[in-house]
Amino acid sequence: PFGWRIVGTLFGVAMLPLMYALAKRVTKSSKWAGLATFLFAVDGMHFVQTRIATIDVYGVFFIMAMCLCMLKYWQMNFYADGLKRTFRSLGACGILFGFAIASKWIGFYAGAGLAVAFFTTLYKRYKEYKEAKQYLAAEGLEEEKKEFCTHIVQTFPRYTIQTLLFCVGFFLIIPAIIYLLSYLPYLLCAEKPYTLADVWGVQTYMFNYHSQLTATHPFQSPWYQWPLMIRPIYYYAGANLPEGMMRSIAAFGNPAVWWTGFASVIACLFMLA
């Protein structure tokens, strides 16, 4: 039905400015950000998945949004930008993380990436702290640089503890509350009054279902074939159509995007190595 699909479609459209913002923040170029957004817009997988009334689109939307906030935090520095300003990006990231896991559990897996980015950022602040102590031990340091190094040495322990405590609230407590609130329609169901024990039962059922799933389907393919789209998913084939007419829905990416993109990722890995 139209009502089931229109909201997911709108979220799919909203992903385009998110992609632009992500690419712009990474590349610092409007040209490359526009190209990334165009390639995303013409991808068949994105087009289909946002129009078939599944919940994946909502999870991916919030994952993209939380990654944008974490990327902004990655590019900030609480020594220079101030602790409160960095908290804005971190807080927004944590709330979006809650929305992501409330939409689908894939938000949990994306949260692992957030953790890596966050602790890497803290490690960079720690390295700056050590370097500042070394600079202060040297002689002949410029007064302005000496003041900033002193600021780093004095604030690192306090800022780090405050940041970690802030993250406990915004990445553990608040997401848990958001996740629980997403079950309000379930708990308030008029036909049968459900309890928190029932909510926990749903969690164990979902985990057991996915961890023990052995069922197959004709269009399944192993994960290592996905980047090459060797066997796309065939969702729908029309029936009872006029002679000479056919209708089908298949989910697969744009080969011009996926194949060249996959090769580009491999090339980037070699360049980093």
Q: Model features per residue range: what roles?
A:
Residues 239-273:
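Hydrophobic, aromatic-rich transmembrane alpha-helices
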Residues 128, 156-159, 166, 175-229:
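Aromatic-rich transmembrane-lumenal/periplasmic boundary elements in polytopic membrane proteins
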Residues 88, 131-135, 147-173:
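Membrane-interfacial entry segments at the cytosolic side of transmembrane helices
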Residues 6-27, 65-69, 267-272:
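Transmembrane-helix motifs of polytopic, lipid-linked glycan transferases
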